Amino acid sequence: MKKYLITGCAGFIGSNFVHYTLKKYPEILLVNLDKLTYAGNLENLKDVEGDPRHVFVQGDICDKELVESLFAKYDFDYVINFAAESHVDRSIKNPEIFVQSNVMGTVNLLQRAKEAWYDADAKTWKEGKKYLQVSTDEVYGALGAEGFFMETTPLCPHSPYSSSKASADMFVMAFHDTYGMPINITRCSNNYGPYQFPEKLIPLMINNVKHHKQLPVYGDGMQIRDWLYVEDHCKAIDMVCNGGKVGEVYNVGGHNERPNIFIVKTIIEQLHDRLKDDGISEDLIKHVADRLGHDRRYGIDPTKIKNDLGWYPETPFEKGIVLTIDWYLDHEEWMEHITSGNYQKYYEEMYKNK
């Protein structure tokens, strides 16, 4: 039975991966470590609470003693690191938190894995072990009107968030190059789907449209992103973890490039038609001052993972956005719990003066 340490399991992508993996593998053990910061919510894991294949541990990936004790207790086969502060606006306001969680947390996980998996006397690594770092296409910087990010594209991050993720990626690769640690890195495009914290574009717009709130759109809204349905991403991570060549980076993209303003207008149209609400219209859109250092376009070339592992994005955007809207409409109580308290304060601070 394979044993995984999953960090950031109560967040958006991490919780979707937990659901995906438990559904796919009848014999597996997931030890899920999450600090439960603002974006980590145990309600995301409510459906698997009683599953004996799932063990939840509340804690910080920076906690050396805790992580050490988990390796000693469970002898993990795989570590998949989803844990990260991930919102660019928050990183601009408070970059130190991103360095601590995204860089120092990653280094702590690498160190503890090295101690547990490397036999210093034999100078060999235990068989069947792997560390997988879940990263982002933002580490590459911005693209022009044409072309795509390749795995060989130089790292050129532009925000404190993407800089912290690029730093973490470089530490992961350094542990491979220096010590021979068995690692992979995946770099994905913009994810969307169930359980996403509503500071991100799609759930934010769905929630605001429903309540006739203004829809803040940065600049002209023509920033282009490649949209990847989260279940497709989970499948890619699973395939890389179990079949990826050690030491390799794999780009994971959706082949769904869309401008942000198109996303917003699509959500307006979908909810107007479904809810039969004339208060839902493009009049809700409010263009606000553009984000500092806002990259204009991202685009991923996933040819390598397709050729090496047979992965491809199965969910076109037109289908994925319908599935996503359906999920949020069916989980209003989840959204109400998420958007109470500290979130409201944060939302006002981010957008009230723009």
Predicted regions and their residues:
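Residue-level recognition of oxygen-bearing side chains
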Residues: L66, I97, M104, F197-L201, ...
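The catalytic Tyr-centered alpha-helix of NAD(P)H-dependent dehydrogenases
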Residues: E146, P157-S164, P194, P198, ...
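N-terminal Rossmann-like NAD(P)+-binding domain of SDR-like oxidoreductases, especially those catalyzing
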Residues: M1-N191, C241, L323, Y328-H331, ...
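Residue-level signature of the cytosolic catalytic core of signaling kinases
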Residues: N41, G50, A145, P194-P198, ...
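Short aromatic-enriched loop/helix-cap "lid" or pocket-rim segments at secondary-structure transitions
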Residues: L42-L45, L143-E146, Q196-E199, I263-K265, ...
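Short histidine/acidic/glycine/proline-rich micro-motifs that form metal-
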Residues: L36, N190-G193, Q223-I224, R291-L292
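Amphipathic alpha-helical recognition patches that constitute DNA-binding helices
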Residues: G8, F12, K130, S159, ...
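C-terminal substrate-binding subdomain of Rossmann-fold SDR/epimerase-dehydratase oxidoreductases
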Residues: K3-Y4, F17, L30, G59, ...
